[in-house]
Each structure stands twice: as C-alpha cells, then as structure tokens.
UniProtKB/Swiss-Prot annotation:
This protein's name: Glutathione synthetase
Catalytic activity: gamma-L-glutamyl-L-cysteine + glycine + ATP = glutathione + ADP + phosphate + H(+)
Taxonomy, superkingdom: Bacteria
Source organism per UniProt: Xylella fastidiosa (strain 9a5c)
Keyword ATP-binding listed: yes
Amino acids binding ATP: 151-208
Molecular function terms, GO-annotated: ATP binding; glutathione synthase activity; metal ion binding
HAMAP family: GSH_S
Residue runs in coiled coils: none
Length: 314
C-alpha cells in the first residue's frame, strides 16, 4: 500500500546526488510507489497543539543535472499515517532541537518519525559513543583547557574536536610539545566556556575510518573505509577521503552488537557508527551517510532494507 513519505532535509537544490543518502532513500520510496513530500526548510510550526509544515509533492530522478520536481507548497498537518524522514544535517543547535520537539508532537499524532525525535535530542554524535566505554579509545570531554592539555601530554598524540561538528570540520591533530596546542584548545573551548573532546590518536586511521550502517540495530555486512589521502589525517569523505568497501570483521560485529540493541531501543532505526581500528569513535544518528557508495561498490540496496523495516511498522 502506498505511504506518504515526508522528508525534512537541507535544501534539495544543493545536494550532490551521487553521494547523498537522503536522495537514495527518496529514490527507493518512489520506486515503491510511495508518495513523496518535501518540507520547505524552516517551515515546521505548531498551531493549537498540532504540527504543520509547508510541504509540496516531490518527484526525484537519478540525473545529476535535473534530479527533482516540486509541486505547489501547502500548509499540511503532520501526523497520522505519515512516514517522516528527519534528515537535517548538524549542527544540532537550538533550531534543530525545536524541530525535533515539533516532530515529537507529530509522532504523538500518529506519524512514524525516523529517527526518533527524542533520540535525536538525547544522542550527541560524539558523546553517544561514550555510552559504550568498553568500545572507545581513551577520551576526555571537558571545558578545562589544562585538563585537555594534560590528556594530550599523557597520550603523546591526540585528536581534538568540537562536539557539534560534522564532515571533519574543526578537527585537529596535536601532540605533546605542539606550540599550537594552547590556541587550539582556546579555540575549541571558546576560552573554557564550551565542551570539547580529546581522544587518543589512532595510528590505524591510515587504514581507514570505517562507517558501519545499522538498520534497527543490525549491521549491514559491509562497511565503507574512508581512507585519508596525501598528508591528510582525516578520512571523512567531505575532507577528501577515499571510500573503499570492506566486509565487516569479527571485532566490527562485536562493536555493532554492543551498540545496536541500545540504538533500536531508543528508536534510532538508521544509524552510522564510526570505527578506527578496534575502537568506536562516533555514533551518527542525525543523517548517516555512505549508503550510495556501499550500494555502488557492493551491489546492495540499503535503502530497500530500511524501507522493508519501515513498511512492517518496526
């Protein structure tokens, strides 16, 4: 039976369809004859206890110069019978949180929201990994620049990053004796006012930062290793990393088994976990990526697996 699939995303005009996971989900929904609806960015609202948005019928095409057609926008209540894909990219700022609160009201009115709005509020992508300390490298999250500096000195090399970034932005590699360490910490913590994360530098990054996708807590059998290029230490695709598919190894599956059940319990139906060597470094719940690369390299249809789960009601 055709469903109404409503997508909350960043402007569709600016996406790169060859790598865009949201676009792959829309293609799969359309292939299944579901009705696609696009939420005008920034248009979610609440009126007398009901969530509304300016939405338009959407058609998509796998054509890099002409990939979508929109119908007329109209104010529509969100709720009963709708599948809402919440796919806005970070930062998870106040406006993002407000949108998830409005989506919680739509969920209470009968919509199926993916991922669960409460989980999107609760699970910071850097902090969430620390729910599973047995899987993580030595990590310190603090505003205290002195403590962060001592951590770097103890580990000898460390990665320093903000809690609200994505795509490799504002990530620093530092070491004991680095003359720039103080200014890096001042910048990341805003002079001791903002939390920052310090994590032991993992030499295995040269072999790739592995993105493992989970659907309802179960891992896809292949991951995408994002391999830094040249003198770069970041593997993120947005930072120029090269993506190479690999089958999951035994330890990858162990990490997924630690993380997956808790993600499923929280309604996080489509999740990306990042693994370097034997260590979990991040859990991505807002808008996990790398689906299209894995589909292309492994002959998969990951969006189809997600829609199979959605259509059964989860």
């Amino acid at each position: 039976m055709p469903l109404d699939v409503v997508v909350v995303m960043d402007p569709i005009t600016g996406i790169k369809i060859a790598k865009d996971t949201t676009f792959a989900l829309l293609l799969e929904g359309q292939r299944r004859s579901h009705r696609l609806h696009y939420v005008h960015p920034g248009s979610l609202s609440l009126n007398e206890g009901r969530t509304f948005a300016q939405i338009a019928p959407l058609q998509v095409r796998d054509n890099k110069t002409d990939w979508y057609t929109l119908g007329e926008f109209s104010e529509t209540q969100l709720g009963q019978g709708q599948i809402i894909l919440m796919r806005k990219d970070p930062p998870v700022n106040a406006e993002f949180i407000y949108d998830t609160q409005l989506l919680s009201i739509a969920q209470a009115a009968g919509a199926q929201v993916i991922n669960h709005p409460q989980g999107l509020r609760d699970l910071n992508e850097k902090l969430a990994a620390q729910l599973f300390p047995q899987c993580c490298p030595p990590t310190l999250i603090s505003r205290d620049m002195r403590a962060l500096k001592m951590f770097v000195q103890k580990q000898e090399q460390a990665i320093l990053k903000p809690l609200d970034g994505m795509g490799g932005h504002s990530i620093f590699r530092s070491s004991n004796g680095d003359p720039n360490l103080n200014v890096i910490l001042e910048t990341l913590t805003d002079g001791g006012r903002t939390l920052a994360i310090a994590q032991r530098y993992l030499q295995q990054i040269i072999e790739g930062d592995k993105r493992i996708l989970l659907i309802d807590g179960v891992p896809i059998d292949h991951c995408l290793a994002r391999i830094p290029q040249g003198d770069e230490f970041r593997g993120n695709m947005a930072a120029g990393g090269r993506g190479e598919s690999r089958p999951l190894n035994e330890h990858d599956r162990w990490i997924a088994a630690q993380v997956g059940p808790e993600m499923r319990r929280r309604g996080m139906r489509f999740v990306g976990i990042d693994v370097i060597g034997d260590y979990l470094t991040e859990i991505n719940v807002t808008s996990p990526t790398c689906l299209r690369e894995l589909d292309a390299q492994c002959g998969l249809n990951i969006a189809g697996q997600l829609f199979d789960a959605i259509e059964t009601g989860g």
